[in-house]
Amino acid sequence: MKLAALLGLCVALSCSSAAAFLVGSAKPVAQPVAALESAAEAGAGTLANPLGTLNPLKLLLSSLGIPVNHLIEGSQKCVAELGPQAVGAVKALKALLGALTVFG
């Protein structure tokens, strides 16, 4: 059971990382004409991605009984209090831990 939870966590983290990479590396497209822009905004609600709200990490944590909303609120408070320098340090630490787990 623990192995399945670990595998699910690894898949969820890799999916989130891959999605963040793809979103960050996407090239900006040309701006639509002003007349089409309002139509695009009106249709955005009807054509929303049904899987856009599906977050595998949230599903995994909530299936394990971990309160996800409480974790999200706490992390948002920490980020707001610490500022951008601390966020950069946490990202660097996360990258270092990721490298250690790959080579360790």
Curated annotation (Swiss-Prot):
Residues spanning the signal sequence: 1-20
GO molecular function, one term: cytokine activity
Pfam families: SCGB3A (PF20490)
One cellular component (GO) term of this entry: extracellular exosome
Domain of life: Eukaryota
Family: Belongs to the secretoglobin family. UGRP subfamily.
Subunit structure: Homodimer; disulfide-linked.
Protein name: Secretoglobin family 3A member 1
Native organism: Homo sapiens (Human)
Gene behind the chain: SCGB3A1
